[in-house]
Amino acid sequence: MLIKYVEFIKSATRAAHYPPGDLPEIAFAGRSNVGKSSLINVLVNRKSLVRTSSTPGRTQLINFFDVNGQFTLVDLPGYGFAKVPLAVKKQWGPMMENYLAKRANLRGVILILDIRRTPVAEDIQMLHWLQAYSIKPILVITKCDKVSKNERGKQSRIIAQTLGVETEELNFFSALNREGKDLIWRRIEEVLPAETAGSAGEAPKAT
């Protein structure tokens, strides 16, 4: 996917504040500190399009970004951070289900997991929601440079078994060495309308 430009559109907490659903959307979901911001920044070849919060999980906002005027990238709020107030945790479920259930232009969700961690209840809940609403999940396993080849194989089997999927459905990624970047773009292009998806490739450097 050749990235010509990426622009922030707006943040929202409820459907009434979402931007118009004129373009197909690809959303990114995952627990706090899973590497979601780094994944998005690498994919669009920007250093700080999405910034990592100093208080992970505390800001419960859905952030929308225009990509090339062709589709919308949606950064969903992280979940599972232990220090988040209970009231904030309770907001996450209804906010996510409302977005997934009512956003008709949502074409796929990148569900992000850390290679070193076993999926948590919220990861499984998110996958079940996607399956219930017939939304294509793209499973991305981050921080793969932090484990050995043998450990990657072992953890992949644990993650797949916990989620109830095949290991072949897992897409491996490293923000450090860019492993998996082109493959993930191909997975995204598979769920975008044909007229939107371009050929996978290196995005131009940001100016």
UniProtKB/Swiss-Prot annotation:
Domain of life: Bacteria
Any one GO MF annotation of this record: metal ion binding
UniProt-listed Gene3D superfamilies: P-loop containing nucleotide triphosphate hydrolases
Recorded GO CC terms: cytosol
Keywords: Cell cycle, Cell division, GTP-binding, Magnesium, Metal-binding, Nucleotide-binding, Septation
Residue runs in coiled coils: none
Cofactor(s) needed for function: Mg(2+)
Biological function: Necessary for normal cell division and for the maintenance of normal septation.
Name the UniProt record assigns to this protein: Probable GTP-binding protein EngB
